[in-house]
UniProtKB/Swiss-Prot annotation:
Protein name: DNA-directed RNA polymerase subunit beta'
Annotated binding of Zn(2+), by residue: 69, 71, 87, 90
GO terms for cellular component: chloroplast; DNA-directed RNA polymerase complex; mitochondrion
Residue sites binding Mg(2+) per the record: 489, 491, 493
Quaternary structure, from the entry: In plastids the minimal PEP RNA polymerase catalytic core is composed of four subunits: alpha, beta, beta', and beta''. When a (nuclear-encoded) sigma factor is associated with the core the holoenzyme is formed, which can initiate transcription.
Keyword Nuclease: no
Phylogenetic classification of the source organism: Eukaryota, Viridiplantae, Streptophyta, Embryophyta, Tracheophyta
BP GO terms, sorted: DNA-templated transcription
Superkingdom of origin organism: Eukaryota
Gene expressing this chain: rpoC1
């Protein structure tokens, strides 16, 4: 149901026949009520005009051309001086042709028909409410057997059948004569019910509150029994308990929405507006029609045939009537959902008819293609790449996309700062991409968030807000920590960018949708912004360092890498020909000096180095034996261990400590340290 003022809600469900007729019926100025489609015709083959009371009737759906009736007369729409406002000859109103997009019609079904969505979809709502097997209900709907309801103290149809089969020969000829008279119909209609009418009677007799109470009592009784020891019986009891829970929830839903269960059986079939099932002409004048038109025609043909059988002849066999009711049911099933749990109906070219369900469901359906996934203004789309220098709440927006998305804001900014005197001059400056344009664009983007969305949007983290910044190239730059929420990676994924326009949308984006405010999963509460893929590989490369330990550069006569001359003349082998060399590992007093040396390309990211560290006794292991001791001329000496180096004085006092590390480790440590300090400052600020 759509609110006519706000248009913010949509509810799909079974509708009463009175509501369908209210949607479709309209009263003409002469008092005639139109809306029922009775003929299976579309356009006349000679005049190429819609047939009266057909699927494209102008009296029901409105004129094809605005203000022009079927006769060709013209009236000005909305002009009160023009009188009357409809044609008395053809009965077509002088209205807007856009009415053919929303004005419905209906088909009055001669026999009730079950809605296939509620019968054959799993779980079957009708089977759940009636607590009967689906196969049994399908046999009843398609007239394979009948539903008996004998009435006490009255002659019954079943008793007469028994007399016909087992009584004496004297009644052998009198009883069949009775079955061909009108009296038989009285007995049959009173005692026997079949088809969708039997389903409707059973649904109408249901008391939903009693169903809830009885199902709850049975569920409790099954729960108190406990395990039987038989695995098959335990599974059977478990399935029955699950069924009772679904039945209770379904009954509560019908009560909560104030929907009567018998509405799942149709007596009036809505007819879509003509513009939603058009007939068009392609090259050569050949008409092409929507499949729904052919399916509607099939329903009308079979429904009219059933009407003729019931009205024109009183001696029509009951089996023939039931067969025709079955055909009407199958035609409506094909219209609503062709091929549901069975073979689909095909046309003469062996092509499957596209039913109403096929039109609205799926990726190319009416909802996802034209209502939910349609193209909107102030939006763009591009490939995402990693932005290693971005903050968590920022994204890189290409200049080409940004200048288009913020063009209206940019024009206003150029005029407001008197750079351009009117819109035309402002647009010309934007086309020429003058430097002042980028400056104003950066100011605009600084106070305007954007929304990034990656399809499919399976949860709320599939669309988040970011602060945009201008970047070069044509790809959207994204922080790798937010990829898990989007279920995205950098192998060619695309994301859409939207600009919130209203103040309410911008406030919602800032307060609820910014990426740094969505660090936890809304479903289970676990961290959603965790390093994955590219970040893990980057951290590994950053901290891997040189795999050679501190002993690698020490003298080892059996290690060929310790010698300069790699080419050895084995004929003149002499160990004295080789000179031992030891690469000097640099010393740094602070991490700033080490990072400065890396920026000056004096050392590499994984170059081992000694970094002076604060005196911390926890670093020193008393049981560890130094690998090497180096003495200086002034009496001081260096004790070299695997992870650290201690400088001691002549009196064996510790002067300073150096740790063995790399520039990658230093950078990683500083990032973590700054993050912890920032968190502590924010926490202390909130606490005060």
């Amino acid at each position: 149901m759509i609110d006519r003022y706000k248009h913010q809600q949509l509810r799909i469900g079974p509708v009463s026949p009175q509501q369908i007729s209210a949607w479709a019926n309209k009263i003409l100025p002469n008092g005639e009520i139109v809306g029922e489609v009775t003929k299976p015709y579309t356009f006349h083959y000679k005049t190429n005009k819609p047939e009266k009371d057909g699927l494209f009737c102008e009296r029901i759906s409105g004129p094809i051309k605005s203000g022009i009736c079927a006769c060709g007369n013209y009236r000005v729409i909305g002009d009160e001086k023009e009188d009357p406002n409809f044609c008395e000859q053809c009965g077509v109103e002088f209205a807007d042709s856009r009415a053919r997009r929303y004005q419905m019609g209906y088909i009055k079904l001669t026999c009730p028909v079950t809605h296939v969505w509620y019968l054959k979809r799993l779980p079957s709502y009708i089977a759940n409410l009636l607590d009967k097997p689906l196969k049994e209900l399908e046999g009843l709907v398609y007239c394979d057997f009948s539903f008996a309801r004998p009435v006490a103290k009255k002659p019954t149809f079943l008793r007469l059948r028994g007399l016909f089969e087992y009584e004496i020969q004297s009644r052998k000829y009198s009883i069949p004569l009775f079955f061909t008279t009108q009296g038989f119909d009285t007995f049959r209609n009173r005692e026997i019910s079949t088809g969708a009418s039997a389903i409707r009677e059973q649904l109408a007799d249901l008391d939903l509150r009693i169903i809830i109470d009885r199902s709850l009592v049975e569920w409790k009784e099954l729960g108190e029994e406990g395990s039987t020891g038989n695995e098959w019986e335990d599974r059977k009891i478990g399935r029955r308990k699950d069924f009772l829970v679904r039945r209770i929830e379904l009954a509560k839903h019908f009560i909560r929405t104030n929907v009567e269960p018998e509405r799942m059986v149709l007596s009036l079939l809505p007819v879509l507006p003509p513009e939603l099932r058009p007939i068009i002409q392609i090259d050569g004048g050949k008409p092409m029609s929507s499949d729904i038109n052919e399916l509607y025609r099939r329903v009308i043909y079979r429904n009219n045939t059933l009407t003729d059988l019931l009205t024109t002849s009183r001696s029509t066999p009951g089996e023939l009537v039931m067969c025709q009711e079955k055909l009407v049911q199958e035609a409506v099933d094909t219209l609503l959902d062709n091929g549901i749990r069975g073979q689909p109906m095909r046309d003469g070219y062996n092509k499957v008819y596209k039913s109403f369900s096929d039109v609205i469901e799926g990726k190319e359906g009416r909802f996802r293609e034209t209502l939910l996934g349609k193209r909107v203004d102030y939006s763009g789309r591009s490939v995402i790449v990693v932005g290693p220098s971005l903050s968590l709440h920022r994204c890189g927006l290409p200049r080409e996309i940004a200048i288009e998305l913020f063009q209206t804001f940019l024009i206003r900014g150029l005029i407001r700062q008197r750079v351009a005197s009117n819109i035309g001059i402002a647009k010309s400056k934007i086309r020429e991409k003058e430097p002042i344009v980028w400056e104003i664009l950066q100011e605009i983007m600084r106070g305007h968030p954007v929304l990034l969305n990656r399809a499919p949007t399976l949860h709320r983290l599939g669309i988040q807000a970011f602060q945009p910044i201008l970047v070069e190239g044509r790809a959207i730059c994204l922080h790798p920590l937010v990829c898990k929420g989007f279920n995205a990676d950098f192998d060619g994924d695309q994301m859409a960018v939207h600009v919130p326009l209203s103040l309410e949308a911008q406030a919602e984006a800032r307060l609820l949708m910014f990426s740094h405010m969505n660090l936890l999963s809304p479903a289970i509460g676990s961290p959603i912004s965790v390093p994955t893929q590219d970040m893990l590989i980057g951290l590994y490369v950053l901290t891997i360092g040189n795999r050679q330990g501190v002993c690698a550069n020490r003298y080892n006569p059996w290690n060929r890498r310790n010698y300069q001359n790699e080419t050895v003349d084995h004929t003149k082998y002499d160990r004295t020909n080789y000179r031992y060399t030891k690469e000097k590992e640099p010393y740094f007093c602070s991490s700033y000096d080490a990072l400065g040396a890396y920026r000056q390309k004096r050392i590499h990211l994984d170059t081992p180095l000694w970094l002076r560290w604060r005196l911390d006794q926890r670093i020193i292991s008393l049981r560890e034996v130094p690998i090497e001791v180096q003495y200086e001329s002034l009496g001081t000496y260096h004790e070299i261990y695997r992870p650290y180096l201690i400088v001691k004085s002549v009196k064996k006092e510790i002067l300073c400590i150096y740790i063995r590390t790399t520039v990658g480790h230093i950078s990683f440590y500083r990032e973590i340290e700054e993050a912890i300090q920032g968190f502590c400052r924010a926490y202390s600020y909130d606490g005060t």
